[in-house]
Curated annotation (Swiss-Prot):
Protein name per the record: Kunitz-type serine protease inhibitor DrTI
Native source species: Delonix regia
Phylogenetic classification of the source organism: Eukaryota, Viridiplantae, Streptophyta, Embryophyta, Tracheophyta
Domain of life: Eukaryota
Pfam families per the UniProt record, alphabetical: Kunitz_legume (PF00197)
Subcellular compartments: Secreted
Length: 185
């Protein structure tokens, strides 16, 4: 399958290094954007959760790639994702996959932030889902690992988790912050 450019909701290409909100492609009942949130009694917002309301955009992320420093993002670009702003209590705002108690969840931080869990090495990709939406997938570095869709665990706080192939993925679109609201680094 040929790699295609990834587009934002206004039809512009999505670029490495720019800021975007990742929000549900399903208007209304689908919920809103994503942000770090507290789960499992942790004091620090380490898990990545989806806002309940579609009026809430969550917090913007920035995509980077170990392969190149700038340019357009394609459906085969290996990505790192990080929130533009980091909670003070976390080591990093970079997205990671943490395996603990049988679940692989999407979180932020480094290994010090997740003493109970195991961080899975790998990278994220954006894949097309229908004509206008996308899904995020995670591809482990281990040769045996094939990529898994990122979905939502609706029990509790709508946390983002790796899904097995038969579950439905989190359908997303990318929204550029309105100019003026974007924080210049």
């Amino acid at each position: 399958s040929d790699a295609e450019k990834v587009y934002d909701i206004e039809g512009y290409p999505v670029f490495l290094g720019s800021e975007y909100y990742i929000v549900s492609a399903i208007i209304g009942a689908g919920g809103g954007g994503v942000r770090p949130g507290r789960t499992r009694g942790s004091m620090c917002p380490m898990s990545i959760i989806q806002e309940q309301s579609d009026l809430q955009m969550g917090l913007p992320v920035r995509f980077s790639s170990p392969e190149e420093s700038q340019g357009k993002i394609y459906t085969d670009t290996e990505l790192e994702i990080e929130f533009v702003e980091k909670p003070d209590c976390a080591e990093s705002s970079k997205w990671v996959i943490v395996k603990d108690s049988g679940e692989a969840r999407v979180a932020i931080g480094g290994s010090e932030d997740h003493p109970q869990g195991e961080l899975v090495r790998g990278f994220f990709k954006i894949e097309k889902l229908g004509s206008l939406a996308y899904k995020l997938v995670f591809c482990p570095k281990s040769s045996s690992g094939s990529c898994s869709d990122i979905g939502i665990n609706y029990e509790g706080r709508r946390s983002l988790v790796l899904k097995s192939s038969d579950d439905s993925p989190f359908r997303v679109v990318f929204v550029k912050p309105r100019s003026g609201s974007e924080t210049e680094s």
